[in-house]
Amino acid sequence: MATHSERVNSDIAPTAEAKFNWIDPLGLQGRLSEEERLLSEAANIFCQSKLLPRVLQAHRHETFDREIMREFGEHGFLGATIPEQYGGAGLSYVDYGLIAREVERVDSGYRSAMSVQSSLVMHPIYAYGSEGQRTKYLPKLA
């Protein structure tokens, strides 16, 4: 007599083995616009060439390189979704996610610092602050 497992498995037709895409497991690249792909590529180039070597040094010396945060601002990574009139890049949340993904590939600590600055500091000022507060604080934080 066949076991339950044997009966269930005999009813399943053999299929071709599924291929897993280790580079893009969620098929994200195919869903992005050309502009989003270019932004992601630019963020990747910065993170791999400029951020990674310095993060390794910061880890070795147990320091936090504050200059990296300034460079995040110069590249529009800080407050990326904040409108340009307040010093942000005026990007979409998808764009912000793509930037965060590239920073995260290098280091969670710097991605967290970027996210805290953008989401917990800048966004509340933009969303709930007065016009005077927005113009006073946001450009300096970006």
PLM regions: where:
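Intrinsic disorder at enzyme termini
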Residues: M1-E35
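Glycine-rich flavin
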Residues: L38, I45, K50-A142
